[in-house]
Amino acid sequence: MTTVKLTYFGHSAFHVEVDGVGIAIDPWITNPLSKTTLEDYLKNFKTDLVVITHAHEDHIGDALEIMRRTGAKFFSIHEIYVDLTQKGFQGIGANIGGPAKLDDVAPGLGIALTPATHSSYDKGVPTGAIIFKDGKALVYHAGDTGLFAEMQFIGELYAPKVALLPIGGHYTMDIEQALLATKLLRPEVVVPMHYNTFPPIRADPNEFKQKVESAGLAKVRVMEPGETVTFEF
């Protein structure tokens, strides 16, 4: 069994602890919904790796300061890797495809970058990311994305245990699109994200929960900023 502790900070910011290894994903800890200060985060959460799905400010967020303060490496698409290494940060660049083996971070750890339909300034393509442990797909963070057909392949290949999906619309999937994404991805648990941070992305996560669960697609866990849930897979 693998223990996964998932903490949500609002917007699309998460900390994922996999058997004691701390991974921050799109860590905009200081977003308007967050109840956690950056100092509290640094004090209470171990960060071994920072995953950046794309170059927009609300996803790079506090990543650079976290890396400066902790010495954590980052993982990203190659173009972000080039940009940040030129600024003195240590990281691992990858591209969309099979999982990168990150045994130097933790034995059995892997991350695969997936497509995402969005934008990323001039810093390569936007991505999602799947965290693996010993070949098992544990957590899929979709990044900022609209619905795309290849989600079916992610489901067929990996069926990630937990899917973190945007539901706010306007810039990403809305509730109806995220509902279909859940069907394609086949996760056990879905956590909605990227909603209610700003007026254009207002959405009701409980409406999403009702639609997904009434269709029998997955269990939906609506997380409050600052909440931590633990899974055993």
Curated annotation (Swiss-Prot):
> Which first-to-last residue range defines the signal peptide?
none
A Gene Ontology MF term for this entry?
hydrolase activity
List the InterPro entries. Metallo-B-lactamas (IPR001279), RibonucZ/Hydroxyglut_hydro (IPR036866), UPF0173 (IPR022877), UPF0173_UPF0282_UlaG_hydrolase (IPR050114)
Which SMART domains has this protein been placed in? Lactamase_B
**What Pfam families does this protein map onto?**
Lactamase_B_3 (PF13483)
| Keyword Translocase included in the entry's annotation | no
**Which keywords does this chain's UniProt record carry?**
Hydrolase
- What superkingdom does the record give? Archaea
Keyword match Hydrolase: yes
Looking up HAMAP family in the UniProt record yields: UPF0173
Q: Describe the family membership recorded for this protein in Swiss-Prot or TrEMBL.
A: Belongs to the UPF0173 family.
Under which name does UniProt file this protein?
A: UPF0173 metal-dependent hydrolase Igni_1254
Q: Which organism is it from?
A: Ignicoccus hospitalis (strain KIN4/I / DSM 18386 / JCM 14125)
Provide the taxonomic classification: Archaea, Thermoproteota, Thermoprotei, Desulfurococcales, Desulfurococcaceae
